[in-house]
């Protein structure tokens, strides 16, 4: 079969998987999301020391009835974002050469990353960190964006063969994140919610940019701190050595 046709079919399968999961999540109950809520809750119990019990059509309630892990805590949007980032990156990097097995492999990796990000997000919420200059809703949104985009960026760096992280390369996970968290809700008419949506829009737009900028600054600082200047004698030896080698080569010719 023509490689371009295979590539197009792979792109179509990836897109349909993401859309199908997005639609499923939009109507799913906590009972239907136990495949991701249950392992997430188990990890939260391990790392937080709290215990939770499942309540049908509600979610996992803590034993002291102060915290609920409900459907919005499932992290399916992060799962979709991670899956799209991994698969689209593979399709772009190995254009017309990618094998079909990368799709289920990306799904498994994205699921594992989602469990880690979800567990971290919920444990942060359980820690009752107080950010005085934000109200409760703003802090919840702030923590969510920082944790989820931070883990998405980390996943990109780890799976992208740990190449040099340039600003142009980091635009890829940023663009995927914006597409899922901003473009899709906007096209679905979420902007009709008014001020609440635009506040959410501002957080999701600005915080990832600050994270990327902070990462690049830290990377530059690290490289500058580990740049060891060569002694003058070494530089001279290399210079004269290379010129000597060149002269010998010319004589040999």
Regions found by a protein language model. Give the residues of each.
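Hydrophobic N-terminal alpha-helices or hydrophobic patches in metabolic proteins across all domains
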Residues: 1-253
């Amino acid at each position: 079969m023509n490689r371009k046709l295979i590539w197009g079919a792979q792109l179509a399968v990836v897109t349909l998987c993401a859309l199908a999961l997005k639609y499923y999540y939009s109507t799913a109950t906590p009972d239907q999301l136990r495949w991701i809520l249950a392992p997430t809750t188990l990890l939260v119990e391990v790392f937080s020391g709290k215990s939770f019990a499942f309540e049908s059509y509600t979610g996992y309630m803590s034993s002291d009835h102060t915290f609920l892990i409900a459907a919005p805590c499932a992290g399916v949007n992060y799962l979709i974002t991670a899956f799209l980032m991994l698969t689209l990156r593979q399709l772009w990097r190995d254009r017309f050469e990618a094998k079909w097995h990368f799709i289920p492999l990306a799904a498994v990796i994205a699921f594992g990353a989602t469990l880690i990000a979800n567990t971290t997000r919920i444990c942060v919420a359980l820690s009752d960190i107080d950010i005085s200059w934000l109200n409760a809703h703003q802090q919840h949104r702030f923590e969510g964006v920082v944790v989820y985009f931070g883990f998405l960026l980390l996943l990109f760096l780890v799976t992208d063969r740990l190449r040099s992280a340039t600003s142009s390369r980091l635009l890829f996970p940023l663009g995927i994140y914006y597409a899922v968290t901003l473009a899709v809700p906007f096209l679905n008419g979420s902007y009709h919610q008014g001020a609440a949506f635009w506040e959410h829009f501002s957080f999701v737009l600005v915080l990832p940019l600050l994270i990327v900028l902070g990462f690049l600054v830290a990377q530059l600082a690290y490289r500058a701190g580990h740049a060891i200047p060569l002694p003058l004698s070494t530089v001279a030896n290399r210079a004269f050595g290379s010129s000597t080698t060149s002269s010998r080569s010319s004589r040999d010719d």
